[in-house]
Structure formats: structure tokens, C-alpha cells
Amino acid sequence: MNLQLSDLQYAVDVAMGRQPGSLLLKNARLVNVFTLEIQHTHILLAGRLIAAVGPAYAQAPAAEVVDLEGRWVAPGLIDGHVHLESSLVSPAEYAKGVVPRGVTGVVTDPHEIANVAGVAGIEWLMQASEGLPLEVWITVPSSVPSTPLETSGAVLGLAEIERLLAHPRVVGVAELMSFPAILAADATELGKVLLAERSRKSPEGHAPTLVGPALQGYLASGIASDHESTTLEEGRAKLEAGCFLMVREGSTTRNLEALAPLLRPEHGERIGLVTDDRLPSDLLREGGVDFLVRKAIGLGVDPAYAIRAGSWNVARHYRLLRRGAIAPGFQADLVVLDDLHSFRAQAVYQQGRRGGWRWPCPRPKSRGRFRTPCGCPNCTPRICKYRPARGRCG
């Protein structure tokens, strides 16, 4: 969100009663992710921003007034770690699937894209995710190729990572998967951590099963998070060591049930919810990070804290300004709910706008050639060249 001075002036004027707001949401039950309380209140918007929240705004002038009649309002959810390419669709199609469910932002690691197309592939993702009603932040893949044994389509070295870190929507260096190299104090791997820190961005982790001295050594590098915990003991050890714990529930790796006891208010801002990899069938049937919020609540997690772990905590971890909460000055990303426990979105506002969103579909970065056997069961396989303009083999 590129705010202008006029946006801030408008928000202040609306809050002070000098101008009418763009939208007044009356009689809301607001999920306050700061206090974990439910507030009976009114929410006044000024364009893309929330201007004011409070009982004093029941009769505030606004271009549009919506009486929520006691419905719940939560901040838009943010998926803290996802590989968008696992959905097998473009960012625009992905957004179509998750925004109506209440997901208004994702932090993606385009690891597979980078291993095929390198910097050009990441730049395509940046272009393809621009202007959507889903905000897409990017972490620069740190392991391209994944191992020295692989033959990848590209290599991302320190120079390429440093260049990509300069992009305003890049929020970190993605999961540093080579934990043996980190533990061996490898100069290249530790250099990636330094690049992230010098850019004031987050070096993200990947530390499956690490506990004890190995975990201490891994975190001593400055790596900030991990999403690979599979047991309660492992998750607790990482929390105790100061790691930002990402609780994952993907399509194949599902850890939420094991880690749900750690989703407690006393753990504050140190836990976030992530999907990592979700297949199209699971996105359609279950949803994105909204499914994690629902499931966490079903497992006994306090609803306000489950929502906080899927919004404010992620925003804080990545320093996403004005995101993840419903309060004056925050971006107006709101989810209206008929029932708090089921977390089924009745309406979604993204940057103060409900529906009517654009779904741009950028052209492919290059024509590309895909070799695939014919799908006919009773004929000899043939090799064909896929022509994107025609959408078929020929």
C-alpha cells in the first residue's frame, strides 16, 4: 500500500469529524487482537484506512453505512509462509480462492519457481501478484538449487539475493534449508543471514527435528523462525529459544493438532499460522489459513488468539506496517463473520473495498516449451510443444 499524505490527512479529518468517512460499520463485535477481547463498537473507514473505532462513532457521517447487527469483525488473515506454486494456479486464481474466505495477505517463498526460472521467475511472480485484492509479500529463496546434487534451471547466489532484497515487497530471505551448513558455520549460508539483516528484513528458518545444541547453534546464526516442528516438545523448545514458531497445516504435512497446546495467550506474538503447501483440492474444500483458524478453535484454542496468530502475529514478525489488526491507522482489511467459532466469511473488505475486485492476469514471462505425453490411453505417446497463445498442444 503506497500511502500518500492525502490518505493520512483524510483519515485524521474523518476521525476528528471534519470530513465524512467512506464507510461506517455499525454495531460490530470486533475481535481485538491486542487485548484478545470482543468489543461491541463501531468502525469508521477513510478510504483504504481505518480512521476510528469506538462507541462514539455510532452516528458518524459516512458515504455508506452498514449495520452489522452484532456480527463479528476480524482482521484479514495473513498466511505467514506459503509456496504459491503448490496451488498449481496463477496468483490471481489463488487470490480468487482465498480472499472470499477472509485471507487478505500471504508471504510466499517462490522456491520451485526460482529453481526453474531463477531471478526472471521471481520477477514474473512480482508482476503477476501486483494489483490483486490479495497482498503478496515475497521471501527470496535461499536454496537454489536445493542441494549441490541437483541440476536446477538457475542458481541464486549472494549477489542475486542482495538484488532481490531491495524490492519493496520482499520481506526476508526464505527458509535456510541447509541447516548442516549453518551448523558448520558455512560462510555462504551465514552471508545470506547477514544480507537479510542488513536490509532490515527477516532471515527465515527450516529446522526439522532440531533441539538441544543443534537448535542453539542454528538460532545463534540469527535465523528468526521455523515452520518444521512436528511435536509439542520440539515446538516448545523452539519457543523457549526465542524462535518465532510457525504452526503448519498443509496438504501433506499437518502439525496443527500436535502443536495446538502452544497456541496460548501467554505466548504472545511468538506464534503464527502457515499453510506451507496446499493443493487446489484442499484449498477448494478446506480453504487457506482460514482453515487453520477454524481447526485451531475446534481444538480448543481461544478464538481471539487463533485469529491473532493468523493475522497480527504474522504482521509483527515481518514488520508489515498497518496490517493485521483493526485499529485507527491500520489498513482496512476486515472479515465479517456470522459466527466466530466457524470463521466463515460473510463479507470481506480489502483496503476498505468489498467486492468488485480486479483479477489481472499478466502474460507469461516467456513462451516456454513443455514436453508431455499425449493423454490418450490407447495410443502411442507423442511429444508435443505447448503453445500458450492457443492453450493446447500443437
Language model segments and positions:
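Active-site microenvironment of metallo-dependent hydrolases
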Residues: 1-47, 51, 99-101, 284-300, ...
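Active-site mouth loops of central-metabolism enzymes
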Residues: 78-90, 145-158, 224, 228
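Histidine/acidic residue-rich metal-binding segments in metalloenzymes
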Residues: 155-174, 181-246, 253-274, 284-298, ...
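Active-site beta-loop-alpha junctions enriched in small/polar residues
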Residues: 83-85, 111-113, 141-146, 176-179, ...
